[in-house]
């Protein structure tokens, strides 16, 4: 019974990180990658168990790859190392609809809108 409770606690922690950690690294390729705190590239806004069935109408990935916009979320962190040696940049600030920066590529400088260093690729 205790091991079952431990497993449930670990699952709860993992799912909380899944929703609230600042999102996916783009390896410095797109400067406007999002942090998946509020609006994600794919809808993490929905719970994982519903994801095969439920999809929100709003799909920012249609727009973002061309313009490098990053959708700000709850807690964007510093970006990881970019593919070409630049840092990814910041995730997002609070509930801002867009992270800072129109920056399709991040070569050696901060491309605002990137995220948590690829921990959650």
UniProtKB/Swiss-Prot annotation:
GO terms assigned for molecular function: calcium ion binding
GO biological process, one term: shell calcification
Signal peptide start-end: 1-16
Sequence repeat residue numbers: 48-51, 52-55, 56-59, 60-63
Chain positions covered by the region annotation 4 X 4 AA approximate tandem repeats of P-I-Y-R: 48-63
Modified-residue entries (Pyrrolidone carboxylic acid), positions: 17
UniProt entry keywords in alphabetical sequence: Calcium, Pyrrolidone carboxylic acid, Repeat, Signal
Tissue: Expressed only at the mantle edge where it is found predominantly in the inner side of the outer mantle fold.
Role of this protein: Displays inhibitory activity against calcium carbonate precipitation, binds calcium and affects crystallization of calcium carbonate in vitro. May be involved in calcification of the prismatic layer of the shell.
Protein's recorded name: Prismalin-14
Organism, scientific name: Pinctada fucata
